[in-house]
Regions:
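Extracytoplasmic/periplasmic, Sec-exported soluble proteins
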Residues: 63, 88-96, 117, 152-159
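Extracytoplasmic low-complexity, Pro/Thr/Ser/Ala/Gly-rich segments
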Residues: 36-95, 174
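Short, structured motif recognition centered on aromatic/hydrophobic residues
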Residues: 71, 100, 104, 125
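Short, well-ordered, aromatic-rich surface patches in folded extracellular/luminal domains
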Residues: 2-3, 31-32, 36-57, 110-174
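A short, structured loop/turn motif at beta-sheet edges
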Residues: 73, 94-97, 127-134
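Charged, amphipathic alpha-helical segments
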Residues: 95-114
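Secretory targeting and sorting signals
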Residues: 1-37
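Residue-level marker of positions within ordered structural domains that often coincide
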Residues: 76, 105, 130
Length: 174
């Protein structure tokens, strides 16, 4: 029996040490969770409803690109004439925004083609309503090039460009 007592003692000390270690880990984990709260979700108003971006040829090496126009759900908008220009605040009328939303959804279903020369810039219209499953991202590669495209693709690209210009031209500076 005398030999069993030291084994029980060592086992008891191991259990006690393990219990202290586990208690410390649990307490520490709770402390970390309280110290780093989950980031707050981005408010819907902070995400632009429409973002229009025109990237020139050779854009891959540039770091100064900005959206040409960002439109919020309430019609508030920010426009930049080019990547070096200061942003201008203003609005876009609600009727233009509504028509643009319908046209973006229609354009999502068409083929705008990709020319063989695809390194000649890119135009993008991002439509991001509050329901993320309704997002539409339209991209036209080499918007000035039409070689190798079908007539339907050319017509779809013209509709895209017309919408892009309509939104830019509807901007009213504050």
């Amino acid at each position: 029996m005398a030999s069993a007592a030291p084994g029980f003692g060592r086992r008891g000390r191991r259990v006690a040490a393990a219990s202290i270690l586990v208690a410390g880990m649990v307490t520490g984990a709770g402390g970390f969770a309280a110290a780093d709260p989950a980031p707050a979700p981005t408010p819907a108003a902070a995400v632009a409803l429409f973002t229009l971006t025109a990237m020139p040829a050779g854009w891959q090496t540039r770091t100064d690109l900005h959206p040409s126009l960002q439109i919020q759900l309430d019609g508030h908008a920010t426009k930049r004439a080019d990547s070096t220009a200061q942003p201008v605040e203003g609005t876009v009328p609600a009727d233009v925004i509504g028509a643009a939303a319908a046209e973006v959804k229609a354009l999502a279903a068409v083929d705008m083609g990709t020319p063989e020369q695809d390194d000649q810039g890119t135009s993008i219209i991002d439509y991001m309503p509050q329901a993320p499953d309704q997002d539409v991202h339209l991209i036209v590669y080499a918007p000035e090039i039409s070689d190798g495209l079908t007539d339907d693709q050319k017509a779809s690209r013209k509709r895209f460009d017309d919408l892009f210009q309509r939104l830019l031209n509807a901007f009213v500076p504050a």
